[in-house]
């Protein structure tokens, strides 16, 4: 299976996909271009599958990709993106066998006309 270069070098592309994947795990919904959304979808699907496995090796593999971002919950406690992935998100998708994300087209971006989409986690 091929991949999109997204007009960047390999290290820039990897960093951008890590950032987008972490943002999607934290926010559960982000707006980006269609090409980026299609690329980050495969990264996030694999991360959620690792989260469902839940063993130590899966946690370490997911930690390689996700940024170490702290999330403030409503009850004033903090958790990292990795904890949210292996706790809340993995529990939500125990019965689902893939297809954890949805891409909704928004229309062209005003500045350059790039096709904007919203990528979100399916409930």
From Swiss-Prot:
Self-association and partners: Part of the 50S ribosomal subunit. Contacts protein L32.
Cellular component GO terms, alphabetical: cytosolic large ribosomal subunit
Top-level taxon in the UniProt lineage: Bacteria
Protein's GO biological process: translation
Record field: transmembrane: none
Pfam families on file: Ribosomal_L17 (PF01196)
Annotated PANTHER family: LARGE RIBOSOMAL SUBUNIT PROTEIN BL17M, RIBOSOMAL PROTEIN L17
Keywords for the protein's UniProt record, in alphabetical order: Ribonucleoprotein, Ribosomal protein
Keyword Ribosomal protein included in the entry's annotation: yes
Database matches in NCBIfam families: L17 (TIGR00059)
Family: Belongs to the bacterial ribosomal protein bL17 family.
InterPro entries (UniProt xref): Ribosomal_bL17 (IPR000456), Ribosomal_bL17_CS (IPR047859), Ribosomal_bL17_sf (IPR036373)
Name by which UniProt lists this protein: Large ribosomal subunit protein bL17
GO molecular function terms attached to this record: structural constituent of ribosome
């Amino acid at each position: 299976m091929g991949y999109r270069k997204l007009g960047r070098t390999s290290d820039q592309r990897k960093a951008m996909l890590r950032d987008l994947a972490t943002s999607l795990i934290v926010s559960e919904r982000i707006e980006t271009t269609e090409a980026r959304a299609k690329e980050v979808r495969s990264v996030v699907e694999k991360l959620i599958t690792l989260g469902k496995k839940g063993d130590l090796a899966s946690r370490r593999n997911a930690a390689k990709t996700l940024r170490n971002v702290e999330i403030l919950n409503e009850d004033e406690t903090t958790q990292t993106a990795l904890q949210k992935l292996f706790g809340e998100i993995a529990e939500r998708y125990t019965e689902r066998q893939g297809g954890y994300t949805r891409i909704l087209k928004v229309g062209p971006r005003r500045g350059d006309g790039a096709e904007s989409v919203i990528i979100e986690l399916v409930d």
